[in-house]
Each structure stands twice: as structure tokens, then as C-alpha cells.
Amino acid sequence: MGHRDKRHSPPELHPPPPSSSLADAGEVARERFPGEHRRGLLPEQYFRWRGGEITRLEAFCDVVFGFALTLLVVSLEVPRNYGEMMAAMRGFLPFAVCFAQLVMIWLAHYRFSRRFGLEDPYTVFLNIVLLFLVLFYVYPLKFVFTLVFSQLTGGDIGHGLGWHEAAVLMRIYAIGFTAVFSLFALMYAHAYKLRDALELNAVEALQTRLAIQENVIMGVVGAVSFALSYVSPGLAGWWYFVLGPTLGIHGAVTGKKVRLLAEKLKLA
């Protein structure tokens, strides 16, 4: 009775052995977090998501994005005759474009939150500024695209709009566009500074740097559009079409770099 029964002793916990290489670190991460990077909406193959349960900050952000979408449709009414029905249909395309832009911003915010799960004061501050911009620019965003599609479809919105007014509208849109993606660049730059605390492996650190580049590209395009609005409001609007090929080339080149590094470190 004076000795302890070793059969009922709790098992000893041993920390994982130190890794001697990046490849070993990748193997340890995959063993400790099986399938972690494949959970949730739009999972990623080479990035382990560090965001756990939905936090109060994420929930608040989702509510604000939902409210912004509500503001897009708050002025819509049920058509009472054929003429009102056709007028409502003309508003479908600008609504769809605005909806797509807000969803794109929400997805970018969702991915950042899932990747890093940061809630330090600086990240919270950037999130609050982002939400302010999203809410503030809902009506300018809707007006700009309603005006554009009205001009393309022969509507009466925008008749009498002068060169100066059109230029001011494009500047307002450019300021919002540039500010939103500059905030995302700052958020990713902050996460990159914390890469050691977040235990980012080489592939995740590379993807974080590439996300900074992508958001800087978006911000630069918006800034150039702002400058072009002083020359030609129309040219300032068409300038945004350079985003397609620019981001396509950037994604193809950087995606190959990520795959090659992942294969080198045996993370695939």
C-alpha cells in the first residue's frame, strides 16, 4: 500500500523534437494539425488557418457587411406596373456589380481573419477603419455604377452631369477603392511582422508577402485612376480594367513560386 501503481499513473507528455530543417518543420506542422488548412469556406492547400472559433470581432464585421448589403437594396420597391418593372430591371446590373464588390471585400477580410486570427489593438483598429469605409462608400458606389449603366442603356440618370461632376465622382470612388486595399496591405504587413509569433512556415510567409503585393497593386491602380480623373473621367473608369490581366499574370507567376517551394519543403 505504500507504493503507487504505475499502471494508473498519467502518461508523460513530451514536446515534439526540434526540427533541423524547414522540411522537418513542415512535417511537424502537418502531423500536429491534420487537415487544419482544409477547414471552412475556401480552404487553402498550403496555408494553415490559425483562426479558431468565430470571434466577436469577426461576428461584428459580418454584421456590418450584411448591413452594407442591406443599404444597397433599401431603396428598391416592388414594381406596380410594366414601366416600373423595366426601371427596376435597369437597376439590376449596377446592383449586381456593387454586390460583387462588397462580397469580394468580405472574402478578402474572411481569408485574412481565418489565416491569422489576429485581434491585437492594431488589427482591431484597421478593421474598424475598414468597416467605416465600407459603410460610408455604399451609396457613392451604388450611384457611380447606376450612373454608368444608365448611360450605357439610355436611361435618364446622369443627364446634365458635367465634366467636373463626373471627375469628382471618379475621385470619390478611387479614394475608397485605394483606401480599402491599402488597409488590407497594412493588415498583411502587420501579420508578416508577427510571422515568428504566428509560427508561419516558409510557404506561408511567402504567401503573406504575395498578399501584400496583390493589395498594393490594387491600391496603386486606384491611385492612378484618381490622377487620371483630372485628365478624363472616362479614362479613369476604364483604367480599372487593367486589374484583370495584371492580377492574372501576378497570380500565375507567384502561384508557381508557391507550388515549387511547397514541393521543395514537401508540404504538398
Could you say what each language-model-derived stretch is?
Residues 2-268:
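Multi-pass alpha-helical transmembrane bundle typical of ion/small-solute transporters
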